[in-house]
Amino acid sequence: FENNPVFAANFTPEAGNEWDTYFGNSAKGNPNGLIDRAQINDSYVIFPQSWAEVADPLLMEPAEALITINNDFSISNNTLTTNIKTEFQQDIEGSFKVIVCITQDNIIAPQKNNDPEIGPTPIDSTYVHNHVLRGTLNGSWGEYVSTTGTVAMNEVYEKTYYIEFPASWIPKDCHVVAFVYNESNKQVLQAEEIPVLN
């Protein structure tokens, strides 16, 4: 579909492409997903029939970190200021990074569809795309919270980021998503999401 003008909308930012290559989602065949980037049977990729089985035990684990997001959006210059605060809830060994992303909902663009029960086939020209990754504010792999090999309970990492929104990003439909992960195995400890306009 890359050369098909019907699918001109590009939903593949640099970070998304890098993650797809590293974790192997497209290579395994869609649909699939990652759950906290946990590896199951030496694979990050988990198929829909296993999502609940993998996610339910993870939801029962105590939080290792908390993330607080505070946004300030300037309508006049289309600029977001977001403060990300990560507070660790226990002593943990490892080096950790934080990634800050922008996602967008309510984007109407063509989507391939083989199921007439959910929409027109073979292409749904008015499909509503949600949770579309628009990009990151601190690179594809984020920034180190700690490189000492350990973080202590109640240790806090805080940083403020700025970004000017392109005209195609609709602030009322966008969210800031932040997550902290273990750099060695890429597993996510905690994530948070709030609207850009809150």
Identify the meaning behind each predicted range.
Residues 1-198:
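Short, conserved sequence motifs used for protein processing/export or organelle targeting and
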